[in-house]
Amino acid sequence: MTKIISGIGSLEKLIDFKDQFFDKRILLVTGKGSFSNSGAELILKNILRNECVFRFSDFEVNPKFEDAERGVAFAREANIDVIMAVGGGSVIDMAKLIKAFYLNPENAQAMVKSKACLLDPKVSLIVVPTTAGSGSEATHFAVVHIGKEKYSLASPLLLPNTVFLDGKLISTCSAYQKACNGLDALAQAIESAWAVGSTEVSIKYAFKALKLCKKYLPKVLKDDAEYEALHGMLEAANFAGQAINISKTTAAHAW
């Protein structure tokens, strides 16, 4: 089960979970600019200053299979024990893909296409979202593109061990980014609510997400958006992710 640490400034509490990464080799998966822009880099630089950290950001938005191959090769060469993803949906997907393929990179493409069971690499996954949209930190799915085809991996092994939801980290996103991300969360909540696979629990999560979107989405688009609103949208995205994690996606999600 994923442990969620939620609150404004919560990333600074990572130090309280040092047992998860102390004296271990950490693969830090990040975006090229968002890691610094969000303020996460400055916080983690202090917390992880004495740790053995290897950063990987050599991949595109909506990761391609070739990107994942490079990530796995980098992680295996570093002999990592922990994966820490700091970023949006593509960053989190990349971290999940590296974990999924870590033990069996030679057969990774076949695993994706055949939906084979994944081997457990015994690597912890810590996730810090810096966008409020995909809810990927709450799901057991990862998306990868092979050529022009979009594939989805699904395994309980892809659920993070620990997630930090910190509204401060999305404060530097542009209004356009926040609008796109917010509509992503809203759409996922609606999709989950009417999905054939919905349950009483998933519907509860979906409606929590919808209520938070209604309350906070207009507010986060303002230049002086308060942390409360930013954090509210981060929680909305997480609830939408928890909902879709249960109900699964519908045809609309293929685009």
Located regions from the model:
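Active-site segments that bind and position negatively charged phosphate/pyrophosphate groups
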Residues: 192-255
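Glycine/serine-rich anion-binding loops at beta->alpha junctions
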Residues: 80-96, 130-136
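Active-site nucleophile and cofactor-binding loops and adjacent substrate-binding regions
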Residues: 60, 86-88, 248-252
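Structural motif
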Residues: 3, 25-27, 54, 81-84, ...
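ATP/NTP phosphate-donor binding region
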Residues: 1-82
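Short Gly/Thr/Asp-enriched flexible loops that form oxyanion-binding sites at enzyme active sites
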Residues: 72, 91-105, 138-141
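A glycine/threonine-rich phosphate-anchoring loop and its flanking beta-alpha core
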Residues: 103-200
